[in-house]
Amino acid sequence: MIYMRVAIIGMGTAGVSVLRQLVKHENFSQLKVDVYDDDRNMGQGVPFQNDSSELLINMPSKSMSLNLDDDQEFWKWYQNQTEFNFSNPQYLPRFVFGHYMKSYLSYYNDQFDNLTIINDKVQEIFTQSDVDDTDLKYHVCTCDDEKEWREYDYLFLTFGTFSYHDPYDLKGTKGYIQTPYPTYHTLDNVKDSD
């Protein structure tokens, strides 16, 4: 059997959504799928990582879903899980939605032998092809060792928002906060006298 090799780089909301669509395809068993993200964000993404329970999703829980066929799937998942219990679940913390997404990635990883989770940072992506060649192969590099580079037929770039642009070169300046996530560490280095 000839396998088509697929990479999904970035496993937050978009990456998990792409994987959910791929596994529904009748030929999914003929794919070899590698998914890339760091261990902290794998399956959750930055905005939905473990963080303060004060950060609520700005949509009612019953209206959230990654499933196009069931717009209450997140709510149903929340009702059936036992890890989280909030007294007013109409608006749940963002990290709970992250756990919902991560639960599907874990489920797919347990169900499918043709899915591989790779917790290495992607350092480079390149193609090698001749002019006018439409049969591209994508190379994903997570280290300098060429033997470790992986080749793919298709590539999904789902890494979300890049880090904030710093037009005033403030990064590294005392008091400047580059990113608010995770919020429970955002103010660690800010003193009352700042």
Q: Residue spans of the language-model regions?
A:
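Extended hydrophobic secondary-structure segments that form protein cores and membrane-embedded regions
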Residues: 7-8, 32-40, 116-121, 156-157
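Helical element adjacent to the flavin cofactor pocket in flavoenzyme catalytic cores
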Residues: 98-117
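Glycine-rich dinucleotide-binding loop and its adjacent helix/turn
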Residues: 159-194
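A conserved short coil-to-beta-strand element within the FAD-binding core of flavoproteins
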Residues: 118-136
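Glycine-rich active-site loop/strand segments that organize a redox cofactor
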Residues: 36-99
